[in-house]
UniProtKB/Swiss-Prot annotation:
A Pfam family matched in the record: Methyltransf_5
Functional summary from the UniProt entry: Specifically methylates the N4 position of cytidine in position 1402 (C1402) of 16S rRNA.
Organism classification: Bacteria, Pseudomonadati, Bdellovibrionota, Bdellovibrionia, Bdellovibrionales
SUPFAM superfamilies linked to this entry: Putative methyltransferase TM0872, insert domain, S-adenosyl-L-methionine-dependent methyltransferases
Annotated catalysed reactions: cytidine(1402) in 16S rRNA + S-adenosyl-L-methionine = N(4)-methylcytidine(1402) in 16S rRNA + S-adenosyl-L-homocysteine + H(+)
Organism listed in the record: Bdellovibrio bacteriovorus (strain ATCC 15356 / DSM 50701 / NCIMB 9529 / HD100)
Protein name, entry field: Ribosomal RNA small subunit methyltransferase H
Enzyme Commission code: 2.1.1.199
Amino acid sequence: MKKYKPKSGERIERQEEVIPPKVELPFEFSPEHYPVLLQEVLAAFYPLRDKKELSYFDGTFGRGGHYMALKYAYPQMKATVMDQDLAAIAFAQSRFQTEVEKGQLNVIHGNFTQFSEHNLNNFDMMLLDLGVSSPQLDQGERGFSFYNDGPLDMRMNQQQGLTAEVLINTASEDELIRIFKEYGEVYRPSRVVRAIVNDRKTKAFQTTGALAGLIERVDGWQVKGHHPATKYFMALRLAVNSELEVVAEAIPKMIRALNPGGRLAVISFHSLEDRIVKNIFRESEDLGRTVTKKVIVPTQEECDRNSRSRSAKLRIFERSAQDELTKL
């Protein structure tokens, strides 16, 4: 059979040569929080398995679930991890003290947009697991969840930034409408916003329960199984932490920090985040390629096991190898 020759200017989609096998994790694998899309993330880095040395960067360490599994699958890996949540940093330094002392793990407190400030480069594997971790959702005092009453905080880094309480009690009616429409994709937030502005004149909103109760009273349960406050809380969290802007700023830098042939995997939980990731990957095709045409989503089995995973989306970018760069 003759080898196909592309026409001038024609782009060829490179296909994966190997279907990665499922990684059977040991019985003692027991992360505090079972990570989303774990097997899919392990598969994303499978083509790098034969490298004698592997460098890994995790910009959203959380409770280290992905790190633990990757360390088991690729024992030659050395890792640098970041998180802006001090609780996650304290957990990493305690749970993985041995790895830190051996120089196998470098733990840094900060937002992943700051990784270039630490002169971090030349990674084979990079991962971002965007959104809120389960421990953050389960702790009412963090203010992320309407199911656990607590102060309206919502800051990923509690040492800095505006709280959701300040935002909800001081932003203008027009600004709140913009936030809920733009970040939460709420179709008609005007009634809820008017109620917020009216009620805060007599008593400021201080707790998640108070805000969720107002939204439930005004909006009602429009979709079965989805609390009416879901999109409103997500919009506030995105606004408080400037999450969309952070993603747009960080990903191009991370692509350039990859070694030739290295891969960046990004898990998002919001359509706007996923759109940003997709567009940046497309705009970066002079540096590499998007590994899969279609976005990767959790299996039904995973969604049944962990309902919080149902909106997760995974995209993978591969930096061109040096020998490929000369051919393009």
